[in-house]
């Protein structure tokens, strides 16, 4: 019954919202059965303006041939923040991402080719002007609606890396106005162009020497110097990959992987029906918090959250802490026992897994002190 489930969840979500730090975020795992009800409930408790995303986790890696109807391969992760405007951390760079960065000019760092321009010329009219091509002498303007990526003094510094440039006023108000999308009478006046200080023969000879030498300036020219202008984006200037709302099993694990992990910890015994893979929680930790974050899992289950926290701390030397809450009778025999074995290490021989280190405390909630407004005689 949906109403019974909501009556169980509502007060818990209200409490969790209060417990969140001001920069905190909550991830709630849910299947299709209660997704719609949970979304409306969370909109009420957290506020629809604090909704961050509905992430689809591909929890299975194979489809049964005898499956009926539309096969359900994903589970949802509803994400809400304590305050509006929360932004996730970037994901670590991958080898595939790094492979796009090359070093054809023997520069200090690998780089990839990027646009030399940026949008919104109308509000950056001082950055709309001509740059004279050092190889051909032709004038290069930003395309319509765009401006040069950096301020003019920075562009001058980069272009001086090819040959000597100077600022010169041109009669090009009509062309600049067209680029900015304004009337010629309204375009900013007095904006100078970056022009070659020497005759084209000397300038192109200087530029050719730089081209052959290597380590070209930040703004370079394609087609062996004869083509258009482009910008280098160095590998160390890109932080990482923004997370998306689809997480494949190859990136964060699947239910079969989670079950195998538990069996390895408990010497082949299947101790839990619906575990989550540690890699799934590790992905959440990567985008949700920093290395000293406090993580609360109020439905701890098999203890995957603690496992993921311990893995992350071992990997990056972080100081994350966890609080697990579990009401079922396996809290001691499975949840806490798993945490202990992960800390100490488990398995034997070639299947041995080194312990993560760390420690934790286990507390058993006793009888309440009060029953209604009266003292509980069982603990008096």
Walk through the language-model features, giving the residues of each.
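Short, conserved secondary-structure transition motifs
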Residues: 59-65, 329, 364-370
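Conserved S-adenosyl-L-methionine
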Residues: 2, 6, 33-37, 274-350
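Residue-level recognition of the N-termini of beta-strands and the immediately preceding loop/turn
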Residues: 23-26, 51-53, 293-296, 318-323, ...
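Short beta-alpha connecting loops at secondary-structure transitions
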Residues: 61-66, 320-327, 374
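Class I S-adenosyl-L-methionine
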Residues: 1-294
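SAM-dependent methyltransferase catalytic region
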Residues: 339-380
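Residues immediately flanking
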Residues: 82, 249, 327, 365-367
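A glycine-rich phosphate-binding loop feature that marks nucleotide/adenosyl-phosphate handling sites
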Residues: 95-96, 172-179, 301-302, 356-365
């Amino acid at each position: 019954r949906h109403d019974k489930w909501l009556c169980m969840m509502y007060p818990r979500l209200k409490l969790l919202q209060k417990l969140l730090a001001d920069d905190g975020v909550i991830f709630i795992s849910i299947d299709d059965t209660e997704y719609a009800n949970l979304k409306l409930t969370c909109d009420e408790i957290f506020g629809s303006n604090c909704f961050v995303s509905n992430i689809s986790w591909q929890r299975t890696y194979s489809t049964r041939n005898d499956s009926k109807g539309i096969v359900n391969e994903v589970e949802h992760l509803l994400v809400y923040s304590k305050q509006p405007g929360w932004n996730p951390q970037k994901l670590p760079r991958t080898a595939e991402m790094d492979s796009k960065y090359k070093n054809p000019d023997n520069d200090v760092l690998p780089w990839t080719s990027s646009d030399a321009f940026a949008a919104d010329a109308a509000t950056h009219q001082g950055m709309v002007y001509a740059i004279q091509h050092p190889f051909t002498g032709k004038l290069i303007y930003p395309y319509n609606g765009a401006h040069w990526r950096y301020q003019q003094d920075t562009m001058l510094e980069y272009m001086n890396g090819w040959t000597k440039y100077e600022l010169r006023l041109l009669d090009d108000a009509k062309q600049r106005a067209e680029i900015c999308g304004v009337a010629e009478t309204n375009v900013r006046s007095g904006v100078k162009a970056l022009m070659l200080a020497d005759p084209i023969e000397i300038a192109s000879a200087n530029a050719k020497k730089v081209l052959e030498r290597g380590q070209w300036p930040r703004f370079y020219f394609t087609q062996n110097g004869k083509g258009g202008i482009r910008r280098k984006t160095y590998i160390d200037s890109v932080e990482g990959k923004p997370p998306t709302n689809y997480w494949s099993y190859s990136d964060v694990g699947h239910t079969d992987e989670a079950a195998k992990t538990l069996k390895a910890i408990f010497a082949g015994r299947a101790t839990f029906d619906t575990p989550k893979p540690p890699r799934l929680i590790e992905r959440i930790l990567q985008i949700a918090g920093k290395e000293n974050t406090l993580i609360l899992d109020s439905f701890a289950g098999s203890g995957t959250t603690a496992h993921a926290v311990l893995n992350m701390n071992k990997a990056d030397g972080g100081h994350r802490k966890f609080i697990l809450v579990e009401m079922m009778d396996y809290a001691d025999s499975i949840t806490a026992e798993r945490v202990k074995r992960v800390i100490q290490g488990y398995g034997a021989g070639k299947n041995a897994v080194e312990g993560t280190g760390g420690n934790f405390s286990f507390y058993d909630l006793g009888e309440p002190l009060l029953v209604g407004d009266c003292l509980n005689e069982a603990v008096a």
